[in-house]
């Protein structure tokens, strides 16, 4: 697989223990669907997201009750917390004081300069970044009057306007998003933004739709953007359980070789040659490898026609036949296994590969520390 090159001059920005931008990997984000003031429900959902592979989570902060909940939520989660603020600068101040790792605002809708300055000074004091969220659906009136309708140039102009507000206050820990529901508009906006400034870009196709339609739309748009080396964090926005957003994001990054800590499944589309229940097997294996944090490529193939060649591209795999399967490792046949134990044997081999990877990681880490 050819390697995707990221913008090399992207400014690195810290979000909690993570660094966004620079030469770092693309980070997966999601957003809670709970009422933020409901601490129990919000924490439970965030922990489910983290278990699924979410690395940064955003919560809405529409009122004082939500802002008051931030300290308790922050205490009980393991991933960085982003707080989403609109209009009320006092909520931003309270969220920052409560332990937010990042806030998302549009400086232009916070109010007078002194209000923006208060938020910026609080963020500076705590050492947290600000995400400027540009959205095609809520561009400033003056920009819509200038361009007639939402355009990529208008979105970039909006971003630069908000960036300048922060830069004029000597604030540079900035992340920018350029979201649109229209895929072509989003692609163009991100391409132009990548050339206009060096701040990290958070990717997203907003209002993309339901689980099925939204997955296709997001993969089409964000895949095109990622293929150009653009993007430092991303969220798949779906009208679904947010855990599904994380699953789709992981698969998308794996497709481009941009996830070094995730296992990947290759499985054939099935045909009349298939003599095993390949679909059930593939689903079971996919579920099994979902939580493995190692770059293992696993193949589940249905016959001997394409099996050996395709298994050569995988670290471990099985090619099924009537009553038995061939277990492959790095393209070499390891052994024949009965159909009834085929999946369990494959899982054992997956575990061995994962343990080898973890041991290698630990050795490298120890070497760096000595």
From Swiss-Prot:
Pathway listed: Isoprenoid biosynthesis; isopentenyl diphosphate biosynthesis via DXP pathway; isopentenyl diphosphate from 1-deoxy-D-xylulose 5-phosphate: step 5/6
Lineage: superkingdom: Bacteria
Gene3D superfamilies: Dihydropteroate synthase-like (3.20.20.20), Sulfite Reductase Hemoprotein, domain 1 (3.30.413.10)
Class of the enzyme per the UniProt entry, highest EC level: oxidoreductase
Reactions the enzyme catalyzes: (2E)-4-hydroxy-3-methylbut-2-enyl diphosphate + oxidized [flavodoxin] + H2O + 2 H(+) = 2-C-methyl-D-erythritol 2,4-cyclic diphosphate + reduced [flavodoxin]
Binding-site residues, [4Fe-4S] cluster: 268, 271, 303, 310
Cofactor dependency: [4Fe-4S] cluster
UniProt-listed Enzyme Commission number(s): 1.17.7.3
Short name of any one Pfam family annotated for the protein: GcpE
GO terms assigned for molecular function: 4 iron, 4 sulfur cluster binding; 4-hydroxy-3-methylbut-2-en-1-yl diphosphate synthase activity (ferredoxin); 4-hydroxy-3-methylbut-2-enyl-diphosphate synthase activity (flavodoxin); iron ion binding
InterPro entries: Dihydropteroate_synth-like_sf, IspG_bac, IspG_bac-typ, NO2/SO3_Rdtase_4Fe4S_sf
Keywords: 4Fe-4S, Iron, Iron-sulfur, Isoprene biosynthesis, Metal-binding, Oxidoreductase
Gene Ontology BP annotations: isopentenyl diphosphate biosynthetic process, methylerythritol 4-phosphate pathway; terpenoid biosynthetic process
Note accompanying the cofactor annotation: Binds 1 [4Fe-4S] cluster.
Function: Converts 2C-methyl-D-erythritol 2,4-cyclodiphosphate (ME-2,4cPP) into 1-hydroxy-2-methyl-2-(E)-butenyl 4-diphosphate.
NCBIfam families referenced in this protein's UniProt entry, alphabetically: ispG_gcpE (TIGR00612), PRK00366.1 (NF001540)
UniProt family annotation: Belongs to the IspG family.
Name listed for the protein in its UniProt record: 4-hydroxy-3-methylbut-2-en-1-yl diphosphate synthase (flavodoxin)
Species lineage: Bacteria, Bacillati, Bacillota, Bacilli, Bacillales
């Amino acid at each position: 697989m050819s390697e995707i090159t990221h913008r090399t001059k992207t400014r690195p920005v810290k979000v909690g223990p993570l660094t966004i931008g620079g030469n770092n990997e693309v980070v997966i984000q999601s957003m809670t669907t709970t009422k933020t003031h409901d601490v129990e429900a919000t924490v439970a959902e965030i922990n489910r997201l983290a278990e699924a592979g979410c690395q940064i989570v955003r919560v809405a902060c529409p009122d004082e009750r939500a802002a008051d909940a931030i300290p308790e939520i922050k205490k009980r989660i393991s991933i960085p917390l982003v707080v989403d603020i609109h209009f009320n600068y006092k909520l931003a101040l309270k969220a920052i004081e409560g332990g937010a790792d990042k806030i998302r605002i549009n400086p232009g809708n916070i109010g007078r300069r002194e209000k923006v300055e208060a938020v910026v000074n609080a963020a500076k004091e705590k050492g947290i970044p600000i995400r400027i969220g540009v959205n095609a659906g809520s561009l400033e009136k003056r920009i819509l009057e200038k361009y007639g309708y939402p355009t990529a140039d208008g979105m970039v102009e909006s971003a630069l306007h908000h960036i300048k507000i922060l830069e004029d206050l000597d604030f540079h820990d900035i992340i920018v998003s350029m979201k649109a529901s229209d895929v072509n508009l989003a692609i163009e906006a991100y391409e132009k933004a990548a050339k206009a400034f060096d701040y990290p870009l958070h990717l997203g196709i907003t209002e993309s739709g339901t689980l099925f339609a939204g997955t296709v739309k997001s993969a089409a748009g964000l895949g095109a953007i990622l293929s150009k080396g653009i993007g430092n964090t991303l969220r798949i926005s779906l009208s679904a359980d947010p855990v599904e957003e994380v699953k789709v994001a992981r698969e998308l990054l794996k497709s481009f070789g941009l996830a070094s800590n995730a296992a990947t499944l290759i499985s054939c589309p099935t045909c009349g040659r298939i003599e095993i229940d390949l679909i059930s097997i593939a689903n079971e294996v996919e579920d099994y490898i979902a939580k493995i944090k190692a770059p293992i490529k696993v193949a589940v193939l249905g016959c001997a026609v394409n099996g050996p060649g395709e298994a050569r591209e995988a670290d471990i795999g099985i090619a099924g036949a009537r009553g038995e399967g061939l277990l492959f490792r790095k393209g070499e046949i390891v052994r024949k296994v009965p159909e009834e134990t085929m999946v369990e044997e494959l899982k054992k081999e997956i575990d061995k590969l994962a343990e080898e990877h973890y041991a290698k990681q630990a050795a490298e880490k120890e070497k760096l520390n000595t």
